[in-house]
């Protein structure tokens, strides 16, 4: 397939994903059952979703309802279910937060299997069972900004147009909460360009012109030009050092 043909197919496919505000709101409403919704699976299949920045587990999903109840008891407010939210400007980006509160908050819940029997949060930290967060100077939980969970929640806030995220780590013995602010500069400087390149050059070509499915060989999937160029440059540098 020529580059021109591939580019035209990319543009047509992106256009097919675009929805007006009414369409985006309708999908969010229809997909609040998440994994139990056929529409949820269909609409997210061809999009890059923020959950891909994290690692979901069966244990975590099964424990989420319990964590939501714990959060509601702590905050004294209702956590509402949320369907698939599609980005207004980039229709191939989407998110499904674990919950939303009013107009300003998303909720992201982690129930790591590794801490299921930890008596306290501090014990889990000291035993190095929670590698994605640490204790800050005030002794409170703090999500590491270089961890993919941080990218996930920033993506959730941006796509859903909310200012804050309640990041919750829950076990049967304790619940820890961190209120994370939306960081527009982090999104602009660390995320959006990389997400666009990954989708347009890695994911989208495989969606519209699958190579892996023909012979089920990973070698059939061609790396994007910029990656091939970087590999070539790196190899040249190694050769020059010999």
Which residues does each PLM region occupy?
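Accessory terminal regions of nucleic-acid processing enzymes
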Residues: 1-242
């Amino acid at each position: 397939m020529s580059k021109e043909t591939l580019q035209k197919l990319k543009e047509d496919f992106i256009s097919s994903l675009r929805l007006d505000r009414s369409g985006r709101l309708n999908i969010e409403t229809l997909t609040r059952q998440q994994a139990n919704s056929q529409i949820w699976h269909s609409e997210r299949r061809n999009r890059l979703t923020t959950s891909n920045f994290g690692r979901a587990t069966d244990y975590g999903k099964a424990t989420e309802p319990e964590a939501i109840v714990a959060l509601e008891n702590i905050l004294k407010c209702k956590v509402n279910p949320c369907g698939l939210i599609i980005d207004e400007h980039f229709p191939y980006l989407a998110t499904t937060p674990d919950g939303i509160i009013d107009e300003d908050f998303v909720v992201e819940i982690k129930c790591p299997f590794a801490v299921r029997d930890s008596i306290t949060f501090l014990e889990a930290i000291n035993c190095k069972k929670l590698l994605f967060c640490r204790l800050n100077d005030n002794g409170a939980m703090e999500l590491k900004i270089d961890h993919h969970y941080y990218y996930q929640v920033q993506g959730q806030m941006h796509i859903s147009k909310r200012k804050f995220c309640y990041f919750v780590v829950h076990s049967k013995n304790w619940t820890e909460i961190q209120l994370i602010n939306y960081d527009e500069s982090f999104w602009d400087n660390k995320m959006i360009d990389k997400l666009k390149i990954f989708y347009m050059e890695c994911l989208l070509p495989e969606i519209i012109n699958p190579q892996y499915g023909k012979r089920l060989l990973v070698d059939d999937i061609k790396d994007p030009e910029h990656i091939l160029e970087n590999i070539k440059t790196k190899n040249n540098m190694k050769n020059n050092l010999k």
